[in-house]
């Protein structure tokens, strides 16, 4: 019979009272939230203790600080008094919105009120949540100190004796990291299934490999690629590292919903799309709602929206990060506190895009520190379009350029910040035809002069500066004919400055290659060599390998240019979608990703001169990612010395290559010898077993001879033994013939 209340003994009732069941975990899980209506309140501690008659004066002084981050009033500030009519050193403040309360905590916590007092600002519900009875142990317990564990060397791959580079391969549900072995098959470092759910991405200096999951982002590193950091951002879709790997930006289309008990994300991230993280601590610095961009002119229909990415753009030294609210402003934040520079955004009517200089530039005649930012605005009413260069942190406009009949503008900084090319697409007055001209700002020269390249007759569809150089390549195309099934041909143009003593002359056209299908430009990270290719095409797959400093004879017409152009080789890779140079500029990988099409996916390895080293068809191939290298630690003088002795080093490298080939050949010969010896040993062993069987059956050693075997059979029969002869018929061939 099942037990009931009536059948319980008195002892059972008392045992239930003595051993009370602990429901604390269930209470915490299903606790009713009482935060509604109190999320606009903050508690400010660290205030001066003043008498009642000075309280209003202190409140008015405090309001100056509070109203910089939100809106409140004297009536919304409550400062309690004790029995002696003295304030207690804290106050309760109500803001108009929860967002203002969050801003007060973020921006005012830890800021000085005066020389002797520092504000400590917390949300009221945080104090209620964490200070509730039972949440904090009244008795101090020293934290447990974990035993020291030596961390892995995050740049161990740079110590490879052969100075090899690594790359990551993403195919199917597997991601692997491999050593590049030139002509030989790559050497596996690690290969894991389900390492990432979306994509993999290296950090800019190669320290971390990022994997992206529905729960957030994880960073991996060290010789064994162990987990280094994780950043919880539900349904994250895009990530971006800062140039020095100090910060990480994550984005999701879904607003964040912070779950109860989440240890890293707080109410500040609730409803946001973007988080800026500190990689060293793994903590969020600040979160934001994303801004959409309009995809183009609206016309009669509602303009399409697209994601603004990267949402935040970093200065070269990571001291500043900026985001744009299209058509309105640029907001510049100071790191690491993520405070708005000057407490206000830069209002720019109509702003369409901006770009930081990729390097810290020293302009002629300017001694103070600055970072440069370039932006452009379209034509508004009778006002012309404008390109401007701003100095940060002063926010001073140091150069402007007015433009007319502008359809679109693209900003291209040279890698050292020496130039910024403004690619201007202009329409005719009738707006029936388009053409492009280039406005090149010479940033390091006094006054930032602008050089105009207006010799282009068609529209530029691609432009790329030489890394650490002063040459560039561009691709132009004519206007597409309405209804035409074939896209118009393209032309590839190479530009270089004129020779002008020690100075850099004007940019001049070296050569134009007509009637091409090329649409992409890939410079070697070391400059000089460039691949001009056709990617994402269904009909053309050519890759042209060019040398801008060919050591052969120079054409007479190009003797005044700081370049000697030479086509080294043209190859094809069917279905090519991506081209990637290794960090040293020695190897190029072309790949065909399943993310674009499903025909002949895989990757091919080439030298800088276009010689194909290997072809690697790979089922469900997705990504090929060279591991970046950090900047060299050698000084400019040491680098100069290395270049000077390069021929001597080359002899050593050639000797090492020959030795490696000899070792490889020796390994092949040794393997063949080993296989031959194993075969000879097997033959010997089989012969010995055969001889033992012959002895057992009384067969002579020469029984393999047919004549001797026949005589042996006759002898056996004479001795009275029975010999069974088996005849086996085997049909060799059948044919059917019809007669008559």
Swiss-Prot record:
WD repeats lie at residues 193-230, 232-289, 302-343, 455-496, 513-556, 571-609. Keywords: Cytoplasm, Initiation factor, Protein biosynthesis, Repeat, RNA-binding, WD repeat. Residues 1-10 have a biased composition (Polar residues). The keyword Acetylation does not apply. One of its GO terms (molecular function) is identical protein binding. It is found in: Cytoplasm. Pfam families: eIF2A, RRM_1. Gene3D superfamilies: 3.30.70.330, YVTN repeat-like/Quinoprotein amine dehydrogenase. SUPFAM superfamilies: RNA-binding domain, RBD, Tricorn protease domain 2. Residues 1-20, 695-721 are annotated as: Disordered. Residues 40-126 form the RRM domain. The keyword Repeat applies. One of its GO terms (cellular component) is eukaryotic translation initiation factor 3 complex, eIF3e. InterPro entries: EIF3B, eIF3B_RRM, Nucleotide-bd_a/b_plait_sf, RBD_domain_sf, RRM_dom, TIF_beta_prop-like, WD40/YVTN_repeat-like_dom_sf. GO terms for biological process: formation of cytoplasmic translation initiation complex. Its main location: cytoplasm. RNA-binding component of the eukaryotic translation initiation factor 3 (eIF-3) complex, which is involved in protein synthesis of a specialized repertoire of mRNAs and, together with other initiation factors, stimulates binding of mRNA and methionyl-tRNAi to the 40S ribosome. The eIF-3 complex specifically targets and initiates translation of a subset of mRNAs involved in cell proliferation. PANTHER family: EUKARYOTIC TRANSLATION INITIATION FACTOR 3 EIF3 -RELATED, EUKARYOTIC TRANSLATION INITIATION FACTOR 3 SUBUNIT B. Belongs to the eIF-3 subunit B family. Component of the eukaryotic translation initiation factor 3 (eIF-3) complex. This is Eukaryotic translation initiation factor 3 subunit B. It comes from Neosartorya fischeri (strain ATCC 1020 / DSM 3700 / CBS 544.65 / FGSC A1164 / JCM 1740 / NRRL 181 / WB 181) (Aspergillus fischerianus). The gene is prt1.
